[in-house]
A protein has these predicted regions:
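N-terminal cap/lid segment of alpha/beta-hydrolase-fold proteins
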Residues: 20-63, 322
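Conserved alpha/beta-hydrolase "acid-adjacent" motif
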Residues: 280-286
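Short beta-strand/loop motif that positions the catalytic acidic residue
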Residues: 267, 273-275, 279
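Short, surface-exposed "cap/lid" segments of acyl-processing enzymes
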Residues: 59-112
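Alpha/beta-hydrolase-fold enzymes
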Residues: 144-245
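Catalytic histidine neighborhood in serine/cysteine hydrolases
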Residues: 294-313
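Alpha/beta-hydrolase active-site loop
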Residues: 117-137
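Catalytic active-site module of serine/aspartate enzymes centered on a nucleophile-bearing elbow/loop
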Residues: 308, 315-357
Length: 357
C-alpha cells in the first residue's frame, strides 16, 4: 500500500506520539542533530501579489546552482521555524540559494501589511513574485517551491501560479511539500472529534487570535475588536475575519475554493508530496482521494508512508543507514534528494537536446 519505506524509532511509530515529540521535544535540540551551520541570511522585503509586502531572508552560496523558496505552517514566524531552518542549512550546504519568508499575516510580514491569509488563493502568486525578485538578486534558476502543513498547501498554489504567472526568463521547475493541508473542511471536522485534535485546534485558534490582535495593534482600522473576540476557533477566525474580504459567503465555500486536493489535477510542473497515513491532524479519508489524484497526474510524485505523524518524520538509525542519510531529518533528505534527481534529469535532457542540434 505504501509507496516508500520509512521507519521511525519504535517509540515514535504512532502519529500522535510523533507529532507531540516533534512539537515539544525535537525543537529543543535540533541544532545538535544537524551537521551544517546556519547560512548568512540577508533580510529582504519582497513585493508579493496585489503589491503586498512580504518579509523574507535570502542566502546565496558561492557557485549556487538553483534556488529553493519556502515557508511554514498555519501559525508562527520565521525566526521560530526551526524545521524550516534545517532545510535552509541543508540546502545551502548542497549549493542551493535559499529564500525563506513570513507568509501573509505572519511574523514581520504582519507588521508590514494588514492583509490577512487566503490559504493559497493569493499566496501562490506571492511565491512567484518572490522568485522573480530573488532572481534579480542573483538567485539562480531553476526555482523550487516548498512548505509544510498549511505552508505545503501554499507552495502547491505557488506551483500552479508559476505555470500561469512566471516570467519567461525565470525557470520555476516545480515544488516539494511535506504533510500539506489538502482539505480544510474535512480535516477541521475530523480534528475536533477526538481529544488530541481538540487540544491542537484550541492551541492553533489561540495563536490565530494573538495574530489578529497583533495586526490590530499596528493597523487598528483593519478589523473590528468585536470580531477578533468572537474568533475562538480556526473556523471562527476565517468566518469572522477572512472570508468577507475574499468575497466568500461561507467558510465552507472558502475551503472548497482554496482546497489543495482540488488543485492537484491542475498542477503541470513536477511536484513531490510527502504524506503520512498516521497524520493525526488530517482526516484519513483524504488519503484515497490523494492517491487517485496522484495517479491521474503524471507530474505528481506521491510518497505515502505508514508512519511520520504531522511534519515529524524523525528516522531511526536503521532508516538513516538504509538511505545513507547524514541525520534523522528523513523528510527534508527525501525532498532534497528528489529535487536533485529532477534537476539532474533536466540537465541531462538539456544536454541531449543540444547534442541533437
Amino acid at each position: 500500500m505504501y509507496k516508500y519505506e520509512y521507519l521511525p524509532p519504535y517509540f515514535l511509530q504512532n502519529g500522535v506520539t510523533m507529532t507531540t515529540y516533534t512539537a515539544l521535544w525535537a525543537n529543543r535540540d535540533w541544532e545538535s542533530k544537524t551537521t551544517h551551520p546556519e547560512p548568512e541570511y540577508h533580510e529582504v522585503i519582497f513585493t508579493g501579489g496585489q503589491g503586498v509586502p512580504i518579509f523574507g531572508k535570502v542566502a546565496i552560496p558561492p557557485n549556487a546552482h538553483s534556488t529553493i523558496v519556502g515557508t511554514y505552517g498555519i501559525t508562527g514566524e520565521l525566526d521560530q521555524q526551526w524545521f524550516l531552518r534545517i532545510l535552509g542549512r541543508k540546502a545551502y550546504a548542497q549549493g542551493y540559494a535559499v529564500v525563506l519568508f513570513d507568509w501573509r499575516a505572519h511574523g514581520k510580514t504582519a507588521e508590514l501589511s494588514p492583509t490577512l491569509t487566503s490559504d493559497g488563493l493569493y499566496e501562490g502568486e506571492d511565491f512567484v513574485r518572490i522568485a522573480e525578485t530573488a532572481a534579480k538578486m542573483g538567485c539562480p534558476s531553476p526555482f523550487w517551491f516548498t512548505g509544510y502543513s498549511l505552508g505545503g498547501q501554499l507552495a502547491l498554489w505557488g506551483v500552479k501560479a508559476a505555470a500561469d504567472l512566471a516570467p519567461k526568463d525565470i525557470n520555476i521547475a516545480g515544488g516539494a511539500v511535506i504533510c500539506p493541508s489538502l482539505d480544510s473542511f474535512r480535516s477541521l471536522t475530523y480534528l475536533v472529534t477526538h481529544p488530541f485534535g481538540k487540544y491542537i485546534e484550541s492551541r492553533i485558534a489561540k495563536e490565530l487570535k494573538k495574530l489578529a490582535w497583533k495586526i490590530h495593534a499596528v493597523y487598528p482600522e483593519s478589523m473590528q475588536p468585536e470580531a477578533i473576540e468572537r474568533a475562538n476557533s480556526i473556523w471562527g477566525f476565517d468566518e469572522e475575519l477572512v472570508i468577507a474580504r475574499l468575497g466568500f459567503a461561507t467558510v465552507a465555500d472558502y475551503y472548497q475554493a482554496s482546497s489543495g486536493l482540488e488543485l492537484l489535477p491542475k498542477l503541470s510542473k513536477p511536484t513531490l508530496i510527502l504524506y503520512a497515513a498516521d497524520d493525526p491532524l488530517f482526516d484519513p479519508a483524504i488519503i484515497p482521494d490523494l492517491e487517485v489524484a496522484a495517479t491521474k497526474n503524471p507530474d505528481i510524485d506521491l510518497l505515502l508512508t505508514r508512519y511520520g505523524g504531522h511534519v515529524g518524520y524523525v528516522s531511526s538509525k536503521k532508516c538513516q543507514n538504509q538511505y545513507e542519510d547524514p541525520d534523522q531529518w528523513w523528510a527534508w533528505n527525501r525532498v532534497l534528494e528528489w529535487i536533485e534527481t529532477s534537476r539532474s534529469q533536466k540537465i541531462e535532457n538539456g544536454s541531449m537536446q543540444k547534442s541533437k542540434v
